[in-house]
Structures are given as C-alpha cells and as structure tokens.
Amino acid sequence: MKAVQFTSLGLPTEVLKVVELPKPAPAEGEIRVKVTKANIIPADIMFIQGKYGIRPELPQIGGFEGTGTVDACGAGVEMPLGTGVIFTGSGVWAEYVCIPAKTAIPKPQAMSDDVACQAFVNPFTAYGMLMEADLQAGDWVMLTAANSAFSKFVIQLASQRGINVIGTVRSDEQKQALLDLGAKAIINEKTENIYKAVKTATDGVMVKAAFDAVGGALADKVLNAMQANGKMFVYGLLSLQPIPLNSGLLIFKNLTIKGFWLSTWMASLTREQRSTIIPEVLTKLTKQDLKADIEASYSIDEILKAIAHMEGPGRSGKILLDFSK
C-alpha cells in the first residue's frame, strides 16, 4: 500500500515521502479501514515537526483524521465489511490503517466522504470550547484566525445559540463570507485597532471569551479587549510566539487563560455526554446545519502540493487527500 511517511522530524517538504509498505493486519480488537479521504490540519504539521502533544514513533505515517470503509476485522470484532467509519489517530495518510474498533464512529449514510473526513477534530473542538466557555445568548466571543475551518464551525454553532462572534483576519477580502456565515463583526488585524473595533462592535461590553489559535502579540491585543472575568482558551500557536502576558491586566480584570486540547476534553466526558454530543454534531453536519468548506483535493502522490496549498495564504476551505485518485 502507499503511505506518507517520515523518518526524521522537520518541515513536511523536507521529510515527507510517499512509500510502499505492507498492508497492515488488524490485531485483536481492531478493524482495518480502507481509507477513502483524509483531512490535513495544522496538528498534522506540528506532529511532523515534533511540536505536538504526542511524539512520533519514527518511522511514522502522517495524518490524524480520515474516513473510509471497514476492510477487515481482528479477533473479537464483529463489524460488517464495507461499513463506513469516521476515525482519528496517528498514521491516517495511508491507503489502509488499523484502529481500535471501539474508537471508530459510524459514518451517517447521508454524509459525504468530503465532510466525513473532517467531521471530528474541528467540529468537536468548536463544540467543546463553546461548552467550556459557558456562553449564553447575547454574550460575545472573539476568534483569532477567524477564516479557519475551526472558526467557521464556531461561528455557525454560536450564531445558532444567539452568541455574538467577533473575529480577526489578515485581509479585508475574507470579511464578507464570515459575516454571511453569522459573525457580527470581523476585524482586519493588520489595519484596524483591535481594542477600538471590539469596543465599537460590542457597544463597550467587550468580549466574555476568546478562542486563540495564533498567540504572540495578537493574543495580547485580544486579552486587552476582554471584559472583567473573561476567559481565553488557547488551542494553537500559528505565530510560534508566546503570549506576552500583562500581569496587571490579568490581576485587575481577573482574566483566565487556559489551554484546550480535544483529546483531553473528549476523555473528560461521561458516557452519557458522549452519547448525546456525538450524534448531535454529526446530525448537524449531515443536514448541513454546519457547513464544511472544501477548497481542493489531492492524491496521496501530491501530498507536498497539498500541504503547500494548505499552508498558503488566502485559502477559504479545507485541503483533502483523496485516495481514489
């Protein structure tokens, strides 16, 4: 089978190679999935560079999120062959992957593979962060990197609940689509004063919560635009720069900054919560109450082109790997 592998840590363009490997055999409790589509997310890039929350076991196959059909079952597993599944785990960028059967999520029949391969990480992170922020109708939440797939899911979920969203982008061309999606205000971080823009948009109320993917000076500006007792949830570091914290601001506004990692949040849920949240999110995606944008699909042999496109400026949708190409 073909797989995208790296044998050392570094930039994807320097360390990724498409290789031929034996088709894996499912162990006890596992299923083998014939992968149809896979997502490319920032966590994939951080993992390849050794900057993610888990370390690669070299040689390592890349990719964390995908969809496909059950191709074989290990001992103790009874799952019909051909069953569509949504799954996460390391080593997804391959034509076949073995995963624990209990972690596979059945794919709704009406859900396309384009949506299914991105149906877990970003939608559930958006749901989880809104849940942790405990926002109510009328509250304000601010998003950095508002044009990202994650932020678009937050905008949709929040607006459905009457929560007001402000976002930052790096070009005016990105504004209108996000406003059409449900955001109340979009700020060009390069040309506008963030504090003044937030004050105007919120009529001086400022924001109760912020979801930050960038870090650095931008996150510091967002903290300054928060109301007393506000909470910032940090889930990324696109700038690769730490947040320069203003101790006085934290003290006198009683601000809270905390990290958010989907794996930790999912593990914290009760069985009852999981049985409610997972179907709710998948139903919204299937009915397109949550819309997932796709910009382009590439074959596994085009992985370097796909990553270059994913990391390039001005992108408006997800970049996928299509294993049928």
What function would you assign to each model-found segment?
Residues 11-13, 20-67:
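N-terminal glycine-rich beta->alpha transition that marks the start or flank
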Residues 67-89:
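A glycine-/small-residue-rich N-terminal strand-loop-strand element
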Residues 84-146:
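NAD(P)H dinucleotide-binding glycine-rich loop of Rossmann-like/cofactor-binding domains
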Residues 123-191:
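Mid-domain Rossmann-like dinucleotide-binding core that forms the NAD(H)/NADP(H) cofactor-binding site
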Residues 194-204:
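Short amphipathic alpha-helix with an adjacent loop that forms part of the alpha/beta core around
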Residues 217-289, 322-325:
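Glycine-rich phosphate-binding loop and adjacent beta-alpha segment
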Residues 287-296, 304-325:
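C-terminal capping/lid region of NAD(P)-dependent oxidoreductase domains
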